Amino acid sequence: MAIIQLSNIKKQYENGILVIDDLNLTVADKELLVLVGPSGCGKSTLLRIIAGLEQVTSGELYIDNERINNREPADRDIAMVFQNYALYPHMTVRGNLEYGLKNRKTPKDEINKRITHAAKLLQIEPFLDRKPRQLSGGQRQRVAMGRVIVRQPRVFLFDEPLSNLDTQLRAQMCIEIKTLQRSLGTTSLYVTHDQLEAMTLADRIVVMNKGAIEQIGTPMEIYDYPETTFVADFIGSPSMNFLDRKTLEQHLGHSLSYSQETDLLAFRPEVILLGEYPNQGAVFHTQIELIKPVGTGCHVLTHWNNNIFTIEIKERLTHDYGQKLSFTVPHQSFHSFNKSTGKRTREN
């Protein structure tokens, strides 16, 4: 069992730069929680604080109700996987796996038992006698994960472990990490700037921006109900399309039934209906700026009233650049926000 609690965490450097500001977060036992956000949002710093590699300016850290602020990293029972594999090049895979256990004076029989178990889980049994230079990038990352698995810690921390891998291998490793974490049941925090990784791996996602939490929720909650314009823009590929409420009302010729504070609307690229359906939603007559083929469909950048929209079409277009394209956004597919606060609003 490992429940992580962060209470009023603040991290400010001596030069005055505030990295994390009054952050509160609880990670449930056996949960895989993913921290996602742009570079500089504080996600990796938060991970390093939990690991004990950075000290907090103020706030409290607990694991299973035990305060760990002043504990040394080695005494926190936490294992961390980094972006760089950090394997010892002169040692075999087996040597890398057993190194930490030997330092802790773990009995030899127990070491062999743990290595056998980890190697089987990670499918690296054939590579135990090889050196890291004889392995592919994906195999090296499995060995790096094996080193933390054999320790059997209370908590796993992953700091962008897949960012050095190509797209196809990254997708494969995401599935393997998710399967592995479920099998072991170890409470885990995973940091990434890649929203696709976050959506694939997470039980819950924490979206961070400028040292603060924008939203916490399941992948589908974050995607379907973004609480801020930042989340709406950051999560989703392509991201949401935004337009001014007054501009849309002028286009439609009537007012829309949103709360008074709503002055910004947004819609996902995939919700559109190709063609004109005025009884179902808002019809847009646009001009094609760019067509990006994606398998059997395409993403289309269109120009409308000084706005550039990206829409997703699940068929191949015969249109060309500069041609007209009409589509409809169903009424229920619009999200409503307030520009000043950046927060989601509710319909009347």
From Swiss-Prot:
Catalytic activity: sn-glycerol 3-phosphate(out) + ATP + H2O = sn-glycerol 3-phosphate(in) + ADP + phosphate + H(+)
The keyword Transport is annotated on this UniProt entry: yes
GO BP annotations, alphabetical order: carbohydrate transport; glycerophosphodiester transmembrane transport
EC number: 7.6.2.10
GO terms for cellular component: ATP-binding cassette (ABC) transporter complex, substrate-binding subunit-containing
UniProt main location, coarse: membrane
Residue runs in coiled coils: none
Classification via Pfam families: ABC_tran (PF00005)
Record flagged with keyword Transport: yes
S-S bridge residues: none
Example of a GO MF term: ATP hydrolysis activity
Membrane topology note: Peripheral membrane protein
Keywords of the record: ATP-binding, Cell inner membrane, Cell membrane, Membrane, Nucleotide-binding, Sugar transport, Translocase, Transport
Subcellular location: Cell inner membrane
Residues binding ATP: G37, P38, S39, G40, C41, G42, K43, S44
Cited InterPro entries: AAA+_ATPase (IPR003593), ABC_transporter-like_ATP-bd (IPR003439), ABC_transporter-like_CS (IPR017871), ABC_transpr_MalK-like (IPR015855), ABC_transpr_MalK/UgpC-like (IPR047641), Mo/tungstate-bd_C_term_dom (IPR008995), P-loop_NTPase (IPR027417)
Domain ABC transporter, residue spans: 4-235
Primary role: Part of the ABC transporter complex UgpBAEC involved in sn-glycerol-3-phosphate (G3P) import. Responsible for energy coupling to the transport system.
PANTHER family linked: MALTODEXTRIN IMPORT ATP-BINDING PROTEIN MSMX, SN-GLYCEROL-3-PHOSPHATE IMPORT ATP-BINDING PROTEIN UGPC
Record's subunit section: The complex is composed of two ATP-binding proteins (UgpC), two transmembrane proteins (UgpA and UgpE) and a solute-binding protein (UgpB).
Family: Belongs to the ABC transporter superfamily. sn-glycerol-3-phosphate importer (TC 3.A.1.1.3) family.
Protein's name in the database: sn-glycerol-3-phosphate import ATP-binding protein UgpC
Organism (species): Bartonella henselae (strain ATCC 49882 / DSM 28221 / CCUG 30454 / Houston 1) (Rochalimaea henselae)
